Every structure is written in structure tokens, then in C-alpha cells.
Amino acid sequence: MKKIFYITSIGIFSILSSCSSVVGVGESKIGKQQPSLSNTRWEVIGNLKTNARPYISFDPETGMNGNGGCNRIFSQNVIIKSQHGDFSIKNIGITRMACPSMDMNVETNFVKMLESANKYVVDKNTLELYKGNMLLIKLHKN
């Protein structure tokens, strides 16, 4: 059972982080001026093979809120500095509703990626979250 859960988690993580790559320094926008993320809803891009549709939005006064795929997620411990694209979300709170295991796996991996990200890049209507130069996840402006 643990083996199946582990394999499923890896598969879901792979789906969520599809197109993950290390960006070449010459073409990188990482560390450069970025637009504000405030008052915009950002939804995960990709075929999740589940009904889960994780999203986040940011408000200067209330922090981050959204949905991890099943449960509401939120944090007031948010640092977003558009000057260099610095990004940090810590202490994410999660409601605890009963959800299908596939949706819970998506949610767990989504929250882990949000808490791991330390840089962001906005390219047109796409928000890319990075840990260093490694792309973790892409979200679309909704």
C-alpha cells in the first residue's frame, strides 16, 4: 500500500511540475523586476487527471488564499517583492475536509511546492514559481 501511495505521489508531482527545467542564465528572467501578483487568481496549468483545480490569489492585506484541490488554503506569512521576484509563503493553513485520495495527493504536492518556492516570474498570463533556477510549477491568470 505504501508503495502504491509513493508511486502515485511521484506521478502527481510529475504532472504538477510538468515542463520543469533548469533555466539557462542567458534567457532567465529570474531575479529581475516582476509585476505585482495582488488581486489576481492563479490556477495550476496542466492535466491533473483529477477534478482538483488548485489555485491561489494574493491580497496585500490578507495574504494568500486559494484552494489546494479540495481544501481551502491560506497564509498571512507571505513575502512577495516584485523588484527582484522574491517569493515566500510559509505556515500555510489548510481546512480538513474529506477528499478523494487523488485530490489529496495533488493538494499535498501543491502546498509543498508553494512552500518551497523562493522566486517568481510572470510571463504574460503565466506565473512561474521557482526554487533557485528550478521551475516548480506554472499557474495561469484566471
Question: Whereabouts are the PLM-identified features?
Answer:
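Positively charged n-region of N-terminal signal peptides that target proteins for export
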Residues: 1-4
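Bacterial N-terminal signal peptides
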Residues: 8-17
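Lipid interaction determinants
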Residues: 19-142
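Short amphipathic alpha-helical "recognition" segments used for binding
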Residues: 6-7, 111
